Amino acid sequence: FGEGLSVLNDKIYQLTWREGRGLVYDVNSLEQIETFNYGQSKEGWGLCNDGKKLYKSDGSEFLWFLNPITLAEEGSVQAYTNKGKLTNLNELEWVDGKIYANRYQKNGVAIINPNNGAIEAVIDFKALKTKVTKHQGLDVLNGMAYNPQTKTLFVTGKRWDKLFEVRIIEN
């Protein structure tokens, strides 16, 4: 099934979870114009871009760099803290020169330096889950979108009945 999306150069790039390939669509017609196979990464979880290249997560600690023209993986960095690697990187967003990555089954979003993989901060969204309607199918934090005009982040989760717009403030 479909996973991460990113828009770059009038194209929509979409990942598939376990099918080992991505899809490319024309941003205006929404027609599929291309497919691409994953390289060393085996799954597709999250996708973002910096205006030049694409960054892809596969559920591991790696962030893969994709060339938007050839769609080849051209390297990677490992996300890490001073205690070790940070695994289960999921949905990605590019925010002011950093990669925001939620971690599967966690309530936080890591702020990652894309040049070296260093985790520079973690945003704790645990309190948001207390504001959604409780039900048996309620699941994890698992969706983000950044609005550069308002500098806000939209955050939600699987089977959540609310979408939160938050502004990140540094202390």
What are these regions (language model features)?
Residues Y13-E19, L54-S60, A101-Q105, V155-R159:
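Conserved beta-strand positions in repeat-built beta-propeller and related beta-rich domains
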Residues F1-N9, G39-G51, S57, K83-V95, ...:
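Beta-rich, blade/repeat-based domains predominating
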Residues R21-G22, F62-W64, G108-V109, D161-L163:
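Structural signal for beta-propeller blades
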Residues G84-A118:
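Loop/turn-rich, solvent-exposed surfaces of beta-rich toroidal or solenoidal domains
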Residues E31-N37, G75-G84, A121-I123, L128-K134:
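A short beta-strand motif characteristic of beta-propeller blades
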Residues F1-G44:
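Blade-loop segments of beta-propeller domains
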Residues A145-N171:
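Blade-level signature of beta-propeller repeat domains, shared across WD40, Kelch, NHL, RCC1
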Residues D26-L30, N67-L71, N113-G117, R167-N171:
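Short loop/turn segments that connect beta-strands within beta-propeller blades
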